[in-house]
Amino acid sequence: MPYVGVGAQKASTNLTGGPMMKAYAFVLAFFLLGLGVLALGKHHSGRRFNQYSKVSIDDIHETDAKTIQDNIKSENIKKYLRIFTQEPHIAGTDANKKVAYAIASAWTEAGLEDVHTLPYEVLLSYPDFENPNSVVIQNSAGKEIFRSKGVSPVIIPDEQSGKYAGHQWLAYGGNGTVSADVVYINRGNANDFKNLKLMGVDVKGKIALMRYGHGFRGDKVYKAQQAGAIGAILFSDTSDVAQDGVDSEHVYPKTIWMPNEGVQRGSLMHGDGDPLSPFYPSKKELFKGRTIEEAKDDGTLPSIPVLPVSYTTALQLLKRMSGRAVPSDWQGFVGGNLTYKLGPGFVNGEKLTINVHSELKTKRIRNVIGYIRGAEEPDRYIMLGNHFDAWVYGSIDPNSGTAVLAEVARAMMQTINETSWRPARTIVFNAWDAEEFGLIGSTEFVEEFVDVLQKRAVVYINMDCIQGNASLHVDTVPTLEHIAIEAAKHVPNPSKRERSRGRNTVYDTWMKVFPEKKAGRPKIRVPGGGSDHAPFLNFAGVPVINFNYKNYTTFDTYPLYHSMYETPFTNIHLMDTEDLAVHRAIGQYWAELAKTFADEVVLPMNTTNLASVMIKSYLPQLKASISGINVSRIDFESIRTQYALLSKSSQDLLVMSKKFQETMQFTFHSFSQNPYDAKHVNAVNERLISTERCFINPRGVSKHNPSARHVLFSVSDSDSYSNSLMAGIQNAIHSYETSPSKKNLREIINQISTVQYSVICVVNTLRDVI
């Protein structure tokens, strides 16, 4: 208490007078307000709380989060799922337009603000639905002895009777008929083509027969075309999709395994976004920078006919193959004990013909956007997204996610209407069109709004579809790993069996099923491609979390992937049989992440972890890559020197990140003292948001993929589903090994320097002064 003079004391002897009582009341109110402020903790929101309450804002945050989770209902998810999967809805069709407006209607009814669509004019591909694709085998006399139907049969009429639903096709495959000998090339990756050549089998002028799995189908076809193939056939091996046997008791609809005439559909485009408008949005009023012929010439689109076949049709090919037996790791289970052969060609002079009927068309697609505007920082976006177009009905991919996202929106708005909670930052709901053709809707959106996103977007959280019922599975960048883990600890376990074993949260099962044993945490990978998070991270530098539920399996995805048997029956009776409890848990996790990013005072981004991962993981991997380069001692020293400089910059990042942690803690303290002065918070958050942007190279890191601009995490050139750590460096090493030259050697050093420059950018971003 400040010193009070004697005269003042004498003048204030009447302590019960009116003016003095008012003064004491004011002081007491101010003191109680201070206690309320001190209780604010690390969260802020638009909630109008009682400043005299003894309940802390952290308690209120947990209560609000639980309320949102409790408001997410399985019955609503089931309702939305049936609405969105009534008929086949391929991108660019009237049926998919109906789904877009059904989503907009659901979001509007829930109470989202400014729900609208964003159209783009893009190049899509369709089959001739009146003339199915086919595989034909003729004997040496030219007589037809086998012809595939090209159509999968209806198994559950109530859900699968849409016209043309069973058509078997692959988008962007070349139109035409080719006859040639067939060659088996396993999974169709780079090593498979290399090993086939070493075994003396030439692909040129042949039809390539390849198994799905362990890579993007478009990359398989791209490599086959590069090797000289004139056609390609893709099939799902029973070792992947029918592991318990192919009799009726062990496949759909009795189980989740693929039935004998099921096929995987998909896109063959080698790249993301509209193939005719790289770098720029495909708007009706804008010029297309590339022609169809140019897209085919540079490998973006295939020019050879390609079709998918069932394992039943594949057996007709495999049992006729001539040539030597395949290596043991190329052997599958089609035909039981059948030994796969390499070819080329069939025994007994039989011939193979494939007929593919396809057409390229420019069509209008439309994304759906809706908002919950933030009360404190409306210009900061927490973005949630899923695509809604499907190859057929899409009850798993993607509309399990579409239904869950609609319910998250509804539950959040219910919470807003029934409590005083409102997110501090804006939550943006996004439904993407034409993802299946090559992430087109999301890529065009990012290309159109990249400048806005780089200024306003905090994070993009993607959930494509539910792939299984065993465990949560998360891909994210190092700065967000901790928050992905922490959120899972707050979501109840959807499995009765898991709860009976003492694993009460989603995190507990995740740690059990997908452990990173050395790190003592669940396994988390860096995001690759294959879904709508990719353009946000790789093109715009917006940090992402991509998650789903899946089973522990060596196969890439679930057996019925992209088949016509993805209808609600599969979700409800085969995959998520406890009243869609897994779907609900996915929604709860999505909402928990969104609310955390929306309401944390200081954004939950950890640059210290990024620096640690760089030093402990990324740099050792890079060192191993450059150590294998066949160069002279002098040239290697030049590479080693630049690597050492990158290592030094990474150490600088670690030091600066730890120092910045102190700044973040000070900001927490300052906000708790005075929540009405947000200048410290804004300064810290601005720098945190900017760190991921440092890794965007405007010139790109891939000659083949215009959307690959992230120098750490861009999608692999060899597999569009996988990330490629420091892709620019890896591409430069590959170029040098293919064609050794001083120029290519210098490019390796240049690419290492480019990564170093990005690391230095992060260091400078975190500094208080330049």
From Swiss-Prot:
InterPro entries: PA_dom_sf, PA_domain, Peptidase_M28, Peptidase_M28B, TFR-like_dimer_dom, TFR-like_dimer_dom_sf. Pfam families: PA, Peptidase_M28, TFR_dimer. The active site is at residue 435. Its EC number is 3.4.17.21. Residues 282-597 are annotated as: Catalytic. It catalyses: Release of an unsubstituted, C-terminal glutamyl residue, typically from Ac-Asp-Glu or folylpoly-gamma-glutamates. Binds 2 Zn(2+) ions per subunit. This is Glutamate carboxypeptidase 2 homolog. It comes from Caenorhabditis briggsae. The lineage of its organism: Eukaryota, Metazoa, Ecdysozoa, Nematoda, Chromadorea. The gene is gcp-2.1.
